[in-house]
Amino acid sequence: VGVDYTSDSQIGTTLDAGRRFGDNDQFGARVNLVHREGETGVPNDRRRTTLLSTGLDYKGDNFRTSLDLGYQKKTFHGSPTSVNISAVDFVPEPPKNDRNFSQKWAYSDIENEFGMWRSEYDITDSWTAYTGLGAQHAHEEGIYSAPKLLDKSGNATVSRLDTNRISDSVSGMAGIRGNFDTGFVSHKVNVGYSAMTKNEKIAWKMSATADNPTTNIYHNTGVAMPDSSNFNGSGGKYSDPLTSGRTRTQGWLLSDTLGVLDDKLLFTAGARHQKVVIRGYNKITGAENDADGFDGSRWMPTYGVVYKPW
């Protein structure tokens, strides 16, 4: 158990507990908890983090497996993001690091749930089969207030950007690795396959330029949040975002590390075939945008030499 204190008033606590079970300690379990919140060294910048993760594993004579599950939520209120300098032709003097040019009403909530599973099985003393699977769900929703700089004095307009983003990813791998000898040459071989798919959903809406209040990035006094009833730009269905992009990758790999002179001299040769497929979709209609798509593959060689004199 731990307790920490950071900056002005950010207090946190942690818990890390684990143990092994069974006649030969073949079963294991571990739990991690983190909660931290409060104001940072920047005025009106409040942050909160919550994390829970659990790990389970089994280690037998020729079979090993593990499962990790986790949840994380990070919340930001009034946290500085960035300064938009697209309307000027100079790089401004940065504000002091104890000045907050963001607004109190700006916030961001980011949630992640994830899981990872991996297993290995020793077919013989020299050969092992392995596999793994992972998945993640992420959700970000927030109201952002990035100031748009107008002059060297630091005057800027404050826009309101509402964002709703959802991301889901699944990845997996499988393969076999082993070692054998051919005469005086040793071999360490690995053959594997991996794949990943990712689905993105995003929608946003932005306040009308005429409604954007003015502020100063060096002397921010705070402004009222622009009215949501008069947005002049939007992308997608905010309450239920449609798919905006999909990505799929897959790859085959083969490698062999050859050793001579009692493995003091090692030479590795390998190759990987990687394929990437990307699709983009209209955020409002859901129709596929051919211009945003990509479909390609390539062979990638790998080689290396290691000499160990001692």
Per-region residue spans from a language model:
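Residues that define the transmembrane beta-barrel architecture of outer-membrane proteins
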Residues: 4, 9-13, 46-50, 111-113, ...
